[in-house]
């Protein structure tokens, strides 16, 4: 792991500086991190993975921006900003949007930073391919290209979830920045994913040559999530069946440790963003900046402390306890004035305007931190996609297709020590997703919107509030964004 990441520390430090040098990165035509072509020896095929590593790093520095995480999760039925204070963050949970809110612009820019970096990486890979002379290297080239296309599709997936119609940036010198419909963007991203499905190895990410790299099964999962949002249940069933039958994935047996250091890159992992402190108490550190910290509890005087954002509402906790949840509740609810299973005490919340419960999935115990490290969540990975979601998508698709979804559904419940159910219904799957995927990348909000349940489940929500507004900074500088989206 150390040898894979270290060569890119200094490269990506420079990229992080570049990403903050413009008030509107979407307008910049030159992709961040693109090494001038005359300085790269594209005949040296041994360096061909470097552009791919750069895109993974961009996922970490851009895709894990703390404000993106908060915008993505706060609209969930069960999560709020953590403070009852009328801020732009709090208003998200009441579906009141301000198009001048800097966070919306940041979300837009950072996902396009990923897309531009992916576009540049594909250009570089294609230049390497011109010098390939054997089948083995050509196979690697196609697999590496598939990894980059997966990450580009991932950025579009998040953009469509947030804004609906967005710009398809086919290359970094594109002049036409008008938007395409959500269906057109989905189709474009699915083409990327199909390339990955066809050319990446059919193994788990933790079996990859570059451990943790996405695989054909990761691409199938993301494709299934696109199709789930589009209501294409036959395709969801087909894709998730293949993962279940041939992917050799399994649920990590300990739900609590799944989110801790022991659960990094386990057999449940479909896609996660990797961090490391290289086993050292000081010095080089690759992390998600404030991604973990923003979710940490108000716990001054302890290294188990963060900003206190992303509060878990009591109404959801009551719902979970009424269901009989124990394992998932203990793991997911990091409660004030309580001691965790690892012995870390979380102080009582003295401010009634702030939450008294935080996301336990982002908690790394003190006894798992490398001695000398004190930053909340250091050396842990950010989980993005996991096999439990595949099982629940499969169950939902089977039920919608008139079949029985009990087997995949109950596989998830068994780990949580919840009673198995028979003749599982669609609503039971949606409820199971609510508990299992709590505070994971806005899954609850997405589920309610895509199924039409939002209008009855979300107070203050209406169809016209399903999507975030176009950022003011974008449409004022790029008037073409206000044109009617095209279906291409």
Question: What are the residue ranges of the model-derived segments?
Answer:
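Short, surface-exposed recognition loops and adjoining beta-strand edges that mediate ligand/DNA contacts
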Residues: 38-42, 46, 65-86, 166-170, ...
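Flexible, polar/acidic helix-loop-strand segments at domain edges
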Residues: 318-386
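Membrane-proximal, proline-rich intrinsically disordered regions
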Residues: 23-71, 240, 471, 479-488
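Conserved, well-structured interaction surfaces
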Residues: 45-63, 84-162, 175-184, 193-205, ...
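Bacterial Sec-dependent N-terminal signal peptides
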Residues: 1-32
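Long, intrinsically disordered, low-complexity segments
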Residues: 23-26, 83, 111-114, 188, ...
């Amino acid at each position: 792991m150390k040898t894979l990441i270290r060569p890119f520390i200094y490269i990506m430090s420079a990229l992080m500086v570049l990403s903050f040098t413009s008030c509107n990165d979407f307008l910049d035509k030159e992709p961040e991190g693109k090494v001038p072509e005359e300085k790269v020896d594209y005949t040296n095929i041994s360096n061909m993975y470097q552009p791919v590593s750069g895109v993974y790093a961009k996922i970490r520095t851009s895709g894990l921006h703390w404000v993106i995480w908060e915008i993505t999760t706060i609209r969930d039925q069960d999560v709020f900003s953590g403070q009852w204070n009328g801020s732009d963050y709090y208003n998200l949970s009441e579906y009141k949007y301000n198009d001048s809110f800097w966070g919306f612009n940041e979300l837009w820019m950072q996902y396009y930073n990923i897309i531009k970096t992916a576009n540049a990486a594909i250009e570089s890979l294609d230049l390497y391919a011109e010098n390939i002379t054997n089948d083995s290297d050509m196979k690697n080239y196609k697999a590496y290209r598939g990894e980059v296309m997966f990450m580009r599709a991932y950025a579009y997936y998040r953009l469509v979830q947030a804004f609906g119609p967005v710009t398809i940036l086919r290359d970094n010198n594109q002049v036409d920045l008008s938007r395409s419909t959500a269906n057109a963007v989905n189709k474009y991203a699915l083409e990327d994913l199909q390339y990955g499905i066809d050319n990446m190895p059919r193994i788990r990410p933790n079996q990859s040559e570059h451990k943790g790299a996405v695989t054909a099964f990761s691409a199938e999962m993301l494709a299934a999530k696109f199709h789930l949002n589009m209501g294409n249940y036959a395709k969801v069933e087909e894709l998730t069946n293949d993962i279940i039958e041939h992917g050799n994935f399994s649920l990590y047996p300990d739900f609590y440790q799944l989110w801790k250091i022991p659960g990094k890159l386990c057999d449940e992992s479909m896609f996660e963003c990797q961090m490391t402190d290289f086993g050292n108490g000081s010095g080089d550190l690759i992390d998600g900046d404030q991604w973990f910290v923003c979710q940490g509890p108000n716990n001054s005087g302890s290294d188990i402390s963060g900003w206190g954002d992303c509060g878990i509402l009591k109404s959801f906790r009551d719902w979970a306890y009424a269901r009989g949840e124990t394992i998932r509740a203990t793991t997911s609810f990091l409660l004030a004035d309580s001691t965790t299973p690892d012995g870390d005490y979380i102080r009582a919340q003295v401010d009634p305007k702030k939450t008294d419960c935080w996301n336990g999935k982002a908690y790394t115990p003190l006894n798992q931190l490398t001695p000398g490290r004190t930053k909340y969540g250091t050396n842990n990975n950010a989980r993005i996609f996991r096999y439990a979601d595949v099982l629940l998508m499969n169950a939902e698709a089977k039920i919608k297709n008139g079949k029985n979804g009990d087997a995949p559904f109950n596989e998830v419940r068994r780990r949580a020590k919840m009673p198995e159910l028979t003749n599982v219904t669609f609503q039971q799957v949606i409820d199971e997703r609510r508990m299992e995927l709590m505070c994971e990348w806005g899954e609850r909000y997405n589920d309610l919107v895509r199924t039409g349940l939002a209008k009855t489940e979300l107070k203050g929500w209406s169809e016209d509030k399903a999507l975030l507004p176009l950022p003011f900074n974008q449409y004022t500088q790029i008037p073409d964004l206000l044109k009617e989206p095209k279906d291409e």
